[in-house]
Amino acid sequence: MGKNIFFNAHHSPVGAFASFTLGHQGNTGGFDLELAHPPDQNIYIGLQEDGSKKYLALPFFGQGEDERARYTSEQDAIKEESAAGVEALSQAEVGIQTEDGIQTEIHHQVNNATSVYIEPFSEKEITRTFEAATDEWQAGDISFKLYSPFTSVPDPALAQEEELKQAIVPSIIAELTVDNTKGKNTRQAFLGFQGNDPYSSMRHLSDTTDGKLCGVGQGRHVAIATLDERVTSASFFTMEGILEPRVKENLHFGLGQVGALLMDVPAGEKQTFRFALCFYRGGYVTTGLDTSYYYTKFFKDIEDVADYTLKHSEQKIAEAHKANQLVSDSSLNEDQKFMLAHAIRSYYGCTEFLLHEDKPLWVVNEGEYRMMNTFDLTVDQLFFELKMNAWTVKNELEQFITRYRYYDTVSFPGDSKEYPGGVSFTHDMGVANAFSRAGYSSYELHALDDCFSHMTHEQLVNWILCAAAYIEHTGDQAWLKEQLPLMEECLTSMVNRDHPDEAKRNGIMGLDSSRCMGGAEITTYDSLDISLGQARNNIYLAGKCWSAYVALEKIFNDAGLHAQAQTVAKSTKMCSYD
């Protein structure tokens, strides 16, 4: 890995639109469920220094807010609930020497009047091993490893229930290893977070499982849990208050926003603790269409998710190591492997496997924009999805057919006369869990000629390319037969957008959709200048048109539709010449 090891990465279950984001210094990560950005939570992963009340932690926290001030008077606010009888709170500024010599600071609210305080490890003390499905940090006597396995999601129409449960359980696995073999004293380690959901309180999972699970969570949506009896759960206003309570009974305090799991490792021992980091969203989660997460068919709540994950953790860890090989065993160079591993993680962090009227519905959200099944990205992710689970490609294509297909007319720029157009598809299916109305995207506006205009022609060729690749990869002849009439419609629509006079066609787009209402169509390069942004007579789009024509020619010839194949062949030839 390169010099900079402090970058955020997604650590995501498949199809849960969730990520445990971690890696950048400060409070820049945490439990991300359906968000457009990292949640900026304090994540606490640390270990007590031998024979001291100083704790060293991985640097994934910043200034912590003490919720106590909301409940107490100004005089009471300066009193700390601790064994030492503390009198004042202050802000600690801890300097970290970076590799380039620049002094940076991580701020965290600590209790300077006691001997308990938390410092981050220095950058030079930390190493990181980053792969497609595992991510490990090592510093001092601790190591912290995350497993976010990914595997093929079985087709729900064919799979057994257990296969699907294993593939889409909404959780990842963490391991914290403490090496106290050289220590002279028992040392305490911790794993916790400061939640920032204003609508949910921190809670203990032991309360709802009769003590079977040890864990902390915020509301019903996120949790850290273990089956390890060596671990104790705790919650309080601050992490420091958890590490030095007045009495241990106070660790079950209900008002604080910090929750943590505590572990004591005796001198001379090395111990590993395993945790499930879980997500759950029950009930309907979208508007426009009433959908729920597919995993809710198998798991009734987050406790159920945690229990299943921990009992199947060995299998999930084995899956993670196998998933690493997809990248590590490739012939790519190291930079390419890094980018692919990052891309895979980001992809799964955006996947949303939903249930609509008892049928599967697959969504990939567009990163921070959260637009749903943006077609420009569906075609980009096509080959990975075909490799991993081709049925999701068909599912997306069918969603475009049944709800996000429309018909238009076309016209030349500056001319209101309309000519036959044909079928096309929307840019996306909605945004931020709000499905858009049938036949319309969340993105596309009318009467524009730049960003936010319609992408009618590009989405038409995207549907053709995705459908052709799916058919070629799977050999799904039944689906091909069902879609042949639509394929013919797509051909008619493409040539109509070239020129209404067959003799004047050149194989590329020449007319704009009536949906532009006097404006002009754009391409996926919507934020660039007219050389790439304008769809009409665009060489970039011409390349996609040529590919679509080549694909259609093969499909029609294989289906015995030779007249249609000849029409396509003419456009293919003209497009390649231009």
Task: Describe the function of each predicted region.
Residues 2-19, 98, 103, 134, ...:
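Acidic/polar, glycine-enriched structural segments that form the non-catalytic walls/loops
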Residues 533-578:
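Active-site neighborhood of glycoside hydrolase catalytic domains
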